[in-house]
From Swiss-Prot:
One of its GO terms (cellular component) is plasma membrane. One of its GO terms (biological process) is symbiont-mediated evasion of host immune response. It is found in: Cell membrane. Keywords: Cell membrane, Membrane, Transmembrane, Transmembrane helix. This is ESX-2 secretion system protein eccD2. Gene3D superfamilies: Phosphatidylinositol 3-kinase Catalytic Subunit, Chain A, domain 1. The chain crosses the membrane at residues 135-155, 170-190, 196-216, 222-242, 248-268, 281-301, 364-384, 389-409, 418-438, 449-469, 487-507.
Amino acid sequence: MTAPHKVAFPARCAVNICYDKHLCSQVFPAGIPVEGFFEGMVELFDADLKRKGFDGVALPAGSYELHKINGVRLDINKSLDELGVQDGDTLVLVPRVAGESFEPQYESLSTGLAAMGKWLGRDGGDRMFAPVTSLTAAHTAMAIIAMAVGVVLALTLRTRTITDSPVPAAMAGGIGVLLVIGALVVWWGWRERRDLFSGFGWLAVVLLAVAAACAPPGALGAAHALIGLVVVVLGAITIGVATRKRWQTAVVTAVVTVCGILAAVAAVRMFRPVSMQVLAICVLVGLLVLIRMTPTVALWVARVRPPHFGSITGRDLFARRAGMPVDTVAPVSEADADDEDNELTDITARGTAIAASARLVNAVQVGMCVGVSLVLPAAVWGVLTPRQPWAWLALLVAGLTVGLFITQGRGFAAKYQAVALVCGASAAVCAGVLKYALDTPKGVQTGLLWPAIFVAAFAALGLAVALVVPATRFRPIIRLTVEWLEVLAMIALLPAAAALGGLFAWLRH
């Protein structure tokens, strides 16, 4: 005989609502803020009065508030339980007036601390002073393992630069295999502990990548770096597929983006001795292309389906069937619509799947924007060549790229993408100022004063933009002007980058 199921009901509170000369009893939830049902309560009260033949609530919407019977205003952002309202209490619906809401006063410090502690610990734990739990111990252990892995990595790379022996690679690979075994044990035994699996997995990927890079003979170079970066990309993709968490997907995408760019640079350096400036120019152009392709790549990764075309009569106009390309639909005839078993049954994803795809698209976009923003300062550093014949052209290329990064941020609705691009552009500006300051002759004026003034002016400009742009509604002509300036900057950037990289000279000769 099975035990009966227990059903939990939300806490309720029966109160009397008084308005003018009318009194009505209503039952409200006691555990949610009053704001959630306040407007509905007024509408029900108004309908009840009109049903009984009275005039109803004469106050306009949004111009009333609740008071206790003694005239104390109630804060509708809090629940009835937090406000101390009990069953049988009378609340008065009155016009809104100026003033502050009621706040409970405590006669002693101990009473106030006790009440605050009770509120902080209402979810089952004291959030003011978090105790040491098993989760804390596990995360501390992972931090200790990460410290040990860092020491092993440093010693492995140091030893590999000195000797061509396979011992460093074997040592790093052996410890990496142990971490892989630990990740598999967590995956099989405690599948819900994604944090431990991620910790073991990322540390194992780093160790195995270093081991793979150190294994081939010869002095460490571009070929060794390419091998290690490929291992990191494969390991990151494996972790992302296994965990399927939103933040983990963003981290994996950022790692794959950065390592993919570095792998492309290493592959070029394997076959041709390309200068750092030329590589940096190519990276800058590639970063702009990646930013423009971010939505397309995210949609491709998430496998977003085309929209479903229906009619207001409820009959499908177009539908997709199994075996058709994802970007095509077929018209649905009346005979097909009446047949329940026809092969034109629409297979478009429903609401839950669309929401999951949207989260995946957002995570991929965040990762790509973060990865590109991490590479941008290094690329700007490589492009700039102070006190060289074409230094002004390099400065122009870097400045146009930074400006395009900032303007591209307005194309992303989510905050993390835009913030990542703007922060990456700002870091690139600081990197450029730092390179010019370090390259100038040692002196107070050129090495400190002018760079500090420039950085301070740039920060002040950023603060002014942050205060003005979000609160201002710009006219269409201004937005159109910004778009045209962005197009002109792109048109000027490509020839300047080609001239700086020597493409025109190479074509001429």
